[in-house]
Design a protein with these regions (language model features):
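Short helix-capping/linker turns of helical repeat alpha-solenoids
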Residues: 28, 40-41, 58-62, 74-76, ...
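Alpha-helical segment of the N-proximal tetratricopeptide repeat
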Residues: 29-55, 59
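Hydrophobic face of amphipathic alpha-helices that form TPR/SEL1-like repeat modules
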Residues: 33-42, 66-74, 103-110, 139-146, ...
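TPR/TPR-like (Sel1-like) alpha-helical repeat modules
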Residues: 226-244
Length: 256
């Protein structure tokens, strides 16, 4: 399936999608500006969203530092500016916002707006995990898996993924599924397609395009489950519904 290396590149940015951990209840509790910013962002009214986050900052809502930093990192509603993104993530850290530590770690990992420093990235990811930010376990685990900023240690990587999984993180289920799908000599894990499918199904229950994609391929080729072309197409359609540009192309390829 070859997920792991490709997935790692994507998951290293965990925490930079805008509203991955914000509930409507939380937003309403904190005030209008962040909630209105979310609505504007979801409607692709990015300039309005950025304006609301700036107002939220003036209103003392420190989480808005992270959200505005992400806008600058992605160039949505404001000019793309990695240095400004770093400044806002740093302000979030100064206000002890767990997600700020994680996102600042990503910037150091990628060398965006700051000199690349993987050891510093690991430090920020670790602090974010200690403060309860679940996505940081994924980032920290990948650093251990790839030996970046720390010695390569698959056992510690897997431990991070399991901690994230127990907190309901979808990416953790997928990464653990990948490990069982391909096997891992360092962990003494033989390829186990059956167990991989179990993890992919759990991720799909939480809803994830990559999990549905994994299930589609498993059913298409009879890997860990009985071969079933119809189910393969159904799961790929669900993956397509999540990520139309990527997964619809894969759907067309796998149907051949």
């Amino acid at each position: 399936m070859g997920y792991t290396s490709k997935l790692a590149l994507k998951i290293c940015l965990v925490g930079l999608c805008l509203f991955s951990t914000l509930s409507a209840e939380h937003l309403e509790q904190k005030g209008n500006y962040i909630y209105k910013g979310e609505e504007a962002y979801n409607n692709k009214e990015y300039e309005r969203a950025a304006s609301f986050y700036k107002s939220a900052i003036k209103n003392g809502e420190s989480l808005a530092y992270v959200l505005l930093g992400i806008m600058y990192e992605n160039g949505r509603g404001v000019p793309k500016d990695y240095k400004k993104a770093v400044e806002y993530f740093q302000k979030a850290v100064d206000n002890d916002i767990p997600r700020g530590y994680n996102n600042l770690g990503v910037m150091y990992k990628e060398g965006k707006g700051v000199p690349k420093d993987e050891k510093k990235a690991v430090e920020y990811f670790r602090i974010a995990t200690e403060k309860g930010y679940t996505n940081a376990y994924i980032n920290l685990g990948i650093m251990y898996m790839e030996g970046r900023g720390v010695p390569s240690n698959y056992a510690k990587a897997t431990e991070c993924f399991r901690k994230a999984m127990h907190k309901g993180n979808v990416e953790a289920y997928i990464l653990l599924g990948d490990i069982y799908y391909s096997g891992n000599d360092q962990l003494g894990i033989e390829p186990d397609k059956d167990k991989a499918v179990v993890y992919y199904k759990m991720a799909a229950d939480i809803s994830s395009s990559r999990a549905y994609e994994g299930l589609s391929e498993s059913y298409q080729y009879g890997l860990g489950v009985e071969k079933d072309k119809k189910k393969a197409e159904e799961y790929m359609q669900k993956a397509c519904d999540f990520d139309i540009d990527k997964n619809c192309k894969k759907k067309n390829t796998s149907s051949r």
